[in-house]
């Protein structure tokens, strides 16, 4: 595993409740979540981008509608005991599972593996916001973490991607502590490659 580096520069920012990010190295979900959170912090804190919650809001709306159908079925069955409530229950059950199907499609094809949507405001306030996406993957029983950065021009809507795939051992020390001064440069390198390409066009 990587040796833990010094606490200088940006490293002091990468804390959760003023404690280093420490996880169980054998818990794939915890490893992925800690790396995702750290990558998110780079864009939001270092580059001062503004997070957009549109994807999360969409999922919450679908889940809320599903819950409404479930609550209506429960209340209606209480006020009008079965079999009188049968037609309404049937409609609510069908609607609930329909919404669950929509949620599955939404998370699979809209959200995908995106965990951050961030906006970069135009300093002059003339052009639409540039949009940055972060998405990642870490397969079960695999040590290869893939981080993908997507840039969408607010002006031209052109889209460009950059990604890296590296072993998680590069970013955690023997105690399971995330070494931000090793991880942050990798994230910044992806971001800067897209930002530099944008300036040269």
Swiss-Prot record:
The chain crosses the membrane at residues 60-80, 87-107. It is found in: Endoplasmic reticulum membrane. GO terms for cellular component: signal peptidase complex. Residues 1-59, 108-201 are cytoplasmic. It comes from the Eukaryota. GO terms for biological process: signal peptide processing. Its main location: endoplasmic reticulum. Signal peptide: none annotated. Keywords: Endoplasmic reticulum, Membrane, Transmembrane, Transmembrane helix. Residues 81-86 are lumenal. It is a multi-pass membrane protein. Pfam families: SPC25. Component of the signal peptidase complex (SPC) which catalyzes the cleavage of N-terminal signal sequences from nascent proteins as they are translocated into the lumen of the endoplasmic reticulum. Enhances the enzymatic activity of SPC and facilitates the interactions between different components of the translocation site. Component of the signal peptidase complex paralog A (SPC-A) composed of a catalytic subunit sec11a and three accessory subunits spcs1, spcs2 and spcs3. Component of the signal peptidase complex paralog C (SPC-C) composed of a catalytic subunit sec11c and three accessory subunits spcs1, spcs2 and spcs3. The complex induces a local thinning of the ER membrane which is used to measure the length of the signal peptide (SP) h-region of protein substrates. This ensures the selectivity of the complex towards h-regions shorter than 18-20 amino acids. Belongs to the SPCS2 family. This is Signal peptidase complex subunit 2. The gene is spcs2.
């Amino acid at each position: 595993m990587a040796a833990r580096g010094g606490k200088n520069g940006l490293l002091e920012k990468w804390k959760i409740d003023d404690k280093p990010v420490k996880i169980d190295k054998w818990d794939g979900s915890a490893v992925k979540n800690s790396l995702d959170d750290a990558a998110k912090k780079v864009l939001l804190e270092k580059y001062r981008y503004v997070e957009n919650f549109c994807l999360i809001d969409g999922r919450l709306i679908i889940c809320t509608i599903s819950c409404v159908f479930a609550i209506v079925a429960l209340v209606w069955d209480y006020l009008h005991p079965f079999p009188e409530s049968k037609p309404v229950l049937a409609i609510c059950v069908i609607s609930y599972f329909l919404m669950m199907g929509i949620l599955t499609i939404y998370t699979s094809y809209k959200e995908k593996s995106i965990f951050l949507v961030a906006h970069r405001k135009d300093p002059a306030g003339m052009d639409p916001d540039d949009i940055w996406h972060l998405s990642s993957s870490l397969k079960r029983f695999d040590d290869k973490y893939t981080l993908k950065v997507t840039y969408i021009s607010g002006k031209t809507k052109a889209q460009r991607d950059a990604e890296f795939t590296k072993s998680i051992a590069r970013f955690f020390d023997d105690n399971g502590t995330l070494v931000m001064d090793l991880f942050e440069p990798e994230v910044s390198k992806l971001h800067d490659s897209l930002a530099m390409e944008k300036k040269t066009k």
